[in-house]
Curated annotation (Swiss-Prot):
Disulfides per UniProt: 69-100, 85-95
SMART domains, per the entry: WNT1
Cellular localization per UniProt: Secreted, Extracellular space, Extracellular matrix
One GO term describing the cellular component: extracellular space
Task performed by this protein: Ligand for members of the frizzled family of seven transmembrane receptors. Plays an important role in embryonic development.
Chief location: secreted
Name this polypeptide is given: Protein Wnt-4
Domain of life: Eukaryota
Glycosylation sites: 86
Length: 119
């Protein structure tokens, strides 16, 4: 019939939130590794022998993160002292985690706003 059909395919990134969730999951399960020389090859093995060997899909790291609790200008860490935390959260914004066991002061604040409600 003389007509042509063109099919074009392309790869697209998933939504940013999905990428972030996958990275966070990998970060939470990351394995600390060290280099070992086996023959003439250098391989990465878990620093803790009780951990399973990592796969090509796993996130691994060689050096531990600095202690983010304390002020450390050398590593660019501002520390967490004086920061506002969420008393009910179990995540990184929660007081138990953010305050690094130093304890925290609570403050109850009442905010009154006009809401332009119509009855």
């Amino acid at each position: 019939s003389g007509s042509c059909e063109v099919k074009t395919c392309w790869k697209a990134m998933p939504p940013f939130r999905k990428v972030g969730n996958v990275l966070k999951e990998k970060f939470d399960g990351a394995t600390e590794v060290e280099q070992k020389k086996i023959g003439s090859a250098k391989v990465l093995v878990p620093k803790n022998s009780q951990f399973k060997p990592h796969t090509d899909e796993d996130l691994v790291y060689l050096d531990s993160s600095p202690d983010f609790c304390d002020h450390d200008l050398k590593n660019g860490v501002l520390g967490t002292a004086g920061r506002q935390c969420n008393k009910t959260s179990k995540a990184i914004d929660g007081c138990e985690l953010m305050c690094c066991g130093r304890g925290f002061h609570t403050e109850e604040v009442e905010i009154v706003e006009r809401c332009s409600c119509k009855f």
